[in-house]
Amino acid sequence: MEPPKTMRAIRKTMIVTGASKGIGAGVTNAFIERGYNVVANSLNITASTFAATDRVAVVQGDIGDPSTAQEIASTAIQTFGSIDGVVNNAGIFFTKPFTDYTTQDFEKLSGTNLQGYINITQIAVKQMLRQNSGGSVTCVTSAMVEHPIAGINASLAMVTKGGLEAITRSLAMEYAKEGIRFNAVAPGEVNTPMHANDSREFLKSLSPMGEIEDVADIVDAIVYLTEARHVTGEVLHVDAGAHNGKW
């Protein structure tokens, strides 16, 4: 996929999935403020989600569908001329006792969390290799991959989030010589629309610091990993220390 000959990528271009709200919207706005071009994707998203600018393009669609990933990449190349980074933020999370999960539940979780990652990351890495100027791929996982919590029955969701951490480390080694970096951010409990109906006190009890993370805390970590030239294969926990053990 070659950019138009008349187009020169003056700024770096980021792709952000799950960009309509919460962490995704926060990181999209942060990149815009820092001078990046951004292609923002979500199932339901419009340009009005972000401040008026010619540096953001919007692609609506399910990232678990390969055609959506292709449209995102084509939009990045045709509009801005390059793909320099990806933030795989789109994700699904729900809990059930392990024995109650169905095949359909697993397909739903893996379709977005794993297949969605693969769909856009494969295309983006191919483009980064053509550009020969490195790149960054960051995904959002969960502190519960390393520190499960009794009573939060998220085993199948953690299969997918743990898989993201595994592929992050593998790809970091596979593409280190090409300067393409792969990292992950593992949040604890974040104040996003996903937790709108959850008890604040319960969420605070899941943090050693007794606090709920803000979206800005996760955004800062993603931006850091995107710009840290010699950091790859890392899982950066932003969870008030929850991954370290019992409290």
Please state what every model-predicted region is.
Residues R11-K12, S82-D84, M128-S142, K177-I180, ...:
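Active-site loop of short-chain dehydrogenase/reductase
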Residues S20-K21:
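Conserved glycine-rich cofactor-binding loop
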Residues R34-T49:
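Conserved glycine-rich Rossmann-like NAD(P)H-binding loop of the short-chain dehydrogenase/reductase
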Residues N89-F94, A240-G241:
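Conserved NAD(P)H cofactor-binding loop of Rossmann-fold oxidoreductase domains
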Residues P97-F98, D105-S110, L203:
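Substrate-binding pocket helix/loop in short-chain dehydrogenase/reductase
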Residues T138-G163, T168-K177:
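Catalytic loop of short-chain dehydrogenase/reductase
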Residues I180, D214-V238, H243:
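C-terminal substrate-recognition "lid" of short-chain dehydrogenase/reductases
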